[in-house]
Amino acid sequence: MVIGYTTGVYDLFHIGHLTLLKNAKGLCDKLIVGVTVDELVLYKGKQAMIPYSDRAEIVRSIKYVDAVVPQYDMDKIAACKKLGATVLFVGDDWYGTEKWKKYEEEFAKEGIKIIYFPYTKGISSTKITEALKTTRGWSNDHSLMNKKKDNESNHLNA
């Protein structure tokens, strides 16, 4: 059985995410998806619009996904080994970079193949976020995570 693994924030889930998951599932028997936890998103200098628990539930509901695990760090080799994955699916924007050439060698030593998928042209969570900021006048702190925290505070104060 071929176990595949891929990771992502999966914020503002869009057709590019769906295409990646569909294509990945077509190349493995079991697809495990690591959804990046909120703390790691912040560590990488960004903020998710949708909280981790909601993003994980959205990804879990996709028919191509067999399991969802939290991605707490960037160590994909350790994750693949722990999960028994022999294939890692990543976006082709990393293809050919020095960093990923080294990763390919390291993964190969562990018997893990890296398969690159093309990004869906013209769509990304970042582009959607920017469009929302422009068209709706949203600021950087306009996220459902903040709304959820505000609602929780309001319920506690009621």
Describe the function of each predicted region.
Residues 1-158:
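Nucleotidyltransferase catalytic core that binds NTPs
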